[in-house]
């Protein structure tokens, strides 16, 4: 059987998303940017040949509407939080991790033999070729991780064995937690995949690589309103 992957993208409630950009953007502008980066991320992964499905895991109705509008599935019900998750992560992160785990199990029940990927939602510089290469590298065995450009976070987590749970451990310092739990690091040169956006410096780094059309349009609109808020090209 040809390789097949289902991508899960978790998104917090918009009012809680990208708070580290609050010194640069107000809530409305930050929300618009989050949705634009999500739109670009979904567009790229949906066009990768071996991706057979994309599901957005979110409690937020606006995020769910966007996901459905571009053909993605939505897993809207937060999963129960287990006691084991509590020591390592804050409330929002452990709730999303539980929901990701439940969504991964749901996908595998309905799509036998599919690889499962948990991908960040804020990858405006992602290229399809990068993601395809990372998928191919992940398929050489088990559970694996792409560490972000800071070396501390997780850009993508892969489970390419139906007997191995996804076991997401997103949140601050997630790269270490994923590696310590047995995920192997994937070392490819994939700058767009590794550049998730949490801060103004991250946004500058993404713009230097080149961002997708929805993100570009959002940033152009913000720059027109106030050029000082959008960083350097």
Swiss-Prot record:
The keyword ATP-binding is annotated on this UniProt entry: no
Family: Belongs to the CofC family.
GO biological process, one term: F420-0 metabolic process
Keyword tags: GTP-binding, Nucleotide-binding, Nucleotidyltransferase, Transferase
Catalytic activity: phosphoenolpyruvate + GTP + H(+) = enolpyruvoyl-2-diphospho-5'-guanosine + diphosphate
EC number: 2.7.7.105
InterPro entries associated with the record: CofC, Nucleotide-diphossugar_trans
Organism: Rhodococcus jostii (strain RHA1)
PANTHER family: 2-PHOSPHO-L-LACTATE GUANYLYLTRANSFERASE
A Pfam family: CofC
Cleaved signal peptide residues: none
UniProt superkingdom: Bacteria
Positions bound to phosphoenolpyruvate: 154, 171, 174
Protein name: Phosphoenolpyruvate guanylyltransferase 1
Biological role stated in the UniProt entry: Guanylyltransferase that catalyzes the activation of phosphoenolpyruvate (PEP) as enolpyruvoyl-2-diphospho-5'-guanosine, via the condensation of PEP with GTP. It is involved in the biosynthesis of coenzyme F420, a hydride carrier cofactor.
Molecular-function GO term, any one: phospholactate guanylyltransferase activity
Xref: HAMAP family: CofC
Associated pathway: Cofactor biosynthesis; coenzyme F420 biosynthesis
Main enzyme class: transferase
